[in-house]
Amino acid sequence: MKSRIAILAGFGLALAGCTTATIASNPLQARWNGKAAGAFFAAYGPPLSDTAGAGGTTLYKWRGGFVKGKSCTVELTVNDGYKINNIRAIGDRVDPKGGPSHCEKVLDAADAK
């Protein structure tokens, strides 16, 4: 009986350690998902705002990349370990020639496709 409890406890701990990884669906996610949020903010500046989310996550809003009337605005979902779970452009400029977007260029994600 004790061995069953120990085995079940082991399975429970193993499952508790599992997390769902966000699959990168764009160059920003490919470049930044799983990276330290501190590295992002050190390279590009502090966020505009932060909001507490579910499960210990924090939603940060960042804006920068001001060049010739263009800017980039993204939302970063950061876990309690201060790693980026997801990054999403909410204000971006598409390249009319089909190249990388303004946010992809500014946030070093143009080659992350």
Residue ranges of each PLM-predicted region?
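Bacterial N-terminal signal peptides that target proteins for export
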Residues: 1-8
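C-terminal motif of bacterial Sec signal peptides marking the signal peptidase cleavage site
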Residues: 14-17
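Residues within mature, well-folded domains
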Residues: 19-113
